[in-house]
Design a protein with these regions (language model features):
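Buried hydrophobic positions in well-ordered alpha/beta secondary-structure cores of metabolic enzymes
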Residues: 14, 61, 98, 113, ...
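A short, gly/pro- and small-residue-rich
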Residues: 122-147, 273-289, 363-374
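Short glycine-centered, acidic/aromatic-flanked micro-motifs in structured strand/loop junctions
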Residues: 61-65, 198-200, 274, 362, ...
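An N-terminal, well-structured beta->alpha segment
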Residues: 1-76, 82-83, 159-196
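Proline/glycine-rich low-complexity loops and linkers
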Residues: 90-91, 95, 146-176, 274-354, ...
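N-terminal small/polar loop signature for handling phosphorylated ligands or for N-terminal nucleophile
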Residues: 44, 48, 52, 58-124, ...
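Gly/Ser/Thr-enriched, mixed-charge loops and adjacent short helices
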Residues: 123-252
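Phosphate-binding and adjacent anionic-ligand microenvironments
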Residues: 298-471, 476-504
Length: 504
């Protein structure tokens, strides 16, 4: 039995931890031993799930550019191979590619692991898990970690049965998807005449330029930070990061590009920039993909996370004729709800978070930033042939209001229990004040549409941290200030909830 506390590594539906020293006060807890034990436990979980013995299983391992990726991949492979399972080294890969390794005829793995911590700093790392059903659920990770806790590390000097260039297969798949969308072939250079710049943030997305855009004829001059570098020396590879977005905005405008694309480290998220330098993020990225899909899925339902704005609902429902289901935070929650709707016969082609996680029904419900980019580029090429700009797709999306997020720290020991109590009282106070509470699946949402204010607020409980985020959007600064004033009144008097950020 391991002395490590592996349960502390769980982060929702994956594993996250500190993999190397280098940041003061942060000590390593995602060790080689932990990866070894988790690898073994994953095999035991797969045996039950697949109905196969360990020596019949084939498992792929990929990694992102992080400096601890290779050693953790090796440690996990040692654990997996010790059970008799065959381990394939996919090297530098992307999270979506590792799921597709289960789908592709050339691989058909029974399961796969991706060593990544997404956009987190260089000292962090983690593990994402896949089987034929997609990414594992919270309960699956919990089971795997509990099993791993009772195992002992196993060594194997040659754990990999073979090396496989998965990224090239995955890139070919994406390239052919563009050709199919445009009814063209690679030799016809269907992206000729388009200028597209890419910011890979020194993560894993550099292949998108060399293996997809250039072979299809696009001009990619001005693309930046394409070389994988696990220290991420230029900016955080995160489409939600202000510095990262400023970098791709600048590159797009300076190089007179038709479109700018930015990806996170492991390429399961993306965002875009129009030729004007306008960023397409949060509400607008969801609006854009909804507009692309609307002609093929009229009247369908778009599933989003809880912090999307009323302007998005207006655009989806009034301008596109779609339905908007505003669900919960957490990309797995949003994707699972989309899958559930389709299984019930309610057509839902897209599940997307404001973070840039987006999954299409027609792409295995996989949150794949590169696949979304492929859809966007295909639409850009079609629009260009008709002398249209891609931004015309969301020209009727109302302008963004004045947004703010306040994070209230919970001082109670049992923060979830206390947070739920706060939400109950908050809702009760809102009802007493005769405020408008629309249908909602997470926290308490209030809409304001009167002479006092135009906008909305959402108070919710963080999924993992002792924090209650309060999101507010007002149509104008005056509206936002009025909503903040109302929020102050509604959250007053909770002794173990620190709301002082509202006073700043």
């Amino acid at each position: 039995m391991s002395e490590l506390n592996l349960m502390k590594l769980q982060n929702g539906s994956d594993v996250r931890g500190i993999a190397i020293e280098g940041v003061e006060g942060e000590h390593v807890n995602l060790t080689d031993e932990a990866a070894n034990l988790i690898g073994q436990a994953f095999v035991l979980w797969l045996e039950k799930k697949c109905g196969k013995k360990a020596n019949e299983l084939k498992i792929g391992i990929g990694r992102d550019a992080r400096i601890t990726g290779e050693k953790l991949a090796l440690a996990a492979a040692e654990g997996i191979s010790s059970t008799g399972a065959k381990v394939v080294n996919c090297g530098l890969a992307t999270t979506p590619a590792m799921f597709m390794s289960i789908v592709f005829d050339q691989t058909k793995f029974d399961g796969s692991l991706m060593i990544t911590a997404s956009h987190l700093p260089f000292n962090r790392n983690g593990i994402k898990f896949f089987n034929v059903d997609g990414g594992l659920e919270h309960e699956d990770i919990e089971e795997i970690l509990k099993t791993a806790q009772n195992l002992t590390p196993q060594k194997n000097s040659s754990p990999f049965a073979e090396n496989f260039d998965l990224l090239s297969i995955y890139a070919e798949h994406l390239k052919q998807t563009i050709c199919k969308e445009l009814n063209s072939t690679e030799s016809e250079k269907p992206l000729a005449g388009l200028k597209i710049v890419v910011d890979a943030g020194n993560g894993d997305a550099g292949f998108f330029v060399d293996k997809i855009l250039i072979p299809l004829g696009a001009n990619t001059e001005g693309s930046e930070f394409l070389e994988p570098d696990g220290m991420f020396p230029n900016h955080i590879p995160n489409p939600e990061n202000k510095q990262a977005m400023q970098a791709i905005q600048k590159a797009t405008v300076q190089n007179k590009a038709d479109l700018g694309l930015i990806f996170d480290t492991d390429v399961d998220r993306m965002s875009a920039v129009f030729h004007t330098g306008e960023e397409v993020n949060r509400d607008s990225i969801i609006a854009l993909f909804s507009a692309i899909l609307a002609p093929d899925f009229p009247g369908s339902t778009i599933v989003t996370d809880s912090v999307t704005s009323d302007r998005l609902t207006f655009f989806l429902e009034k301008k596109l004729g779609l339905k908007h289901l505003r669900y919960m935070r957490g990309y797995k929650n949003v994707i699972d709800k989309c899958r559930e709707l389709n299984e019930k016969g309610i057509v839902s082609p897209l599940a997307m978070e404001t973070s840039g996680h987006g999954a299409l029904k027609d792409n295995y419900y996989l949150d794949d930033g590169a696949f979304l980019a492929v859809k966007l580029i295909s639409s850009l090429a079609k629009a260009s042939k008709e002398n249209k700009k891609i931004e015309s797709f969301i020209s009727e999306l109302p302008p963004a209001g004045i947004e703010a997020e306040y994070r209230f720290k919970i001082k109670a020991e049992n923060f979830k229990q206390y947070g739920k109590k706060v939400l109950e009282e908050f809702k009760s106070r809102a009802i007493k004040n005769k405020l408008n509470l629309p249908e909602n699946f997470e926290g308490v949402r209030i809409s304001f549409h009167d002479k006092n204010a135009e906008g909305w607020l959402l108070l919710r409980l963080s999924l993992h941290d002792p924090v209650m985020p309060l999101n507010i959007e007002g149509k104008t600064q005056k509206d936002k200030d009025a909503i903040v004033k109302t929020a102050k009144e509604l959250v007053s008097g909770f002794e173990l909830l620190d709301t002082t950020v509202l006073d700043n």
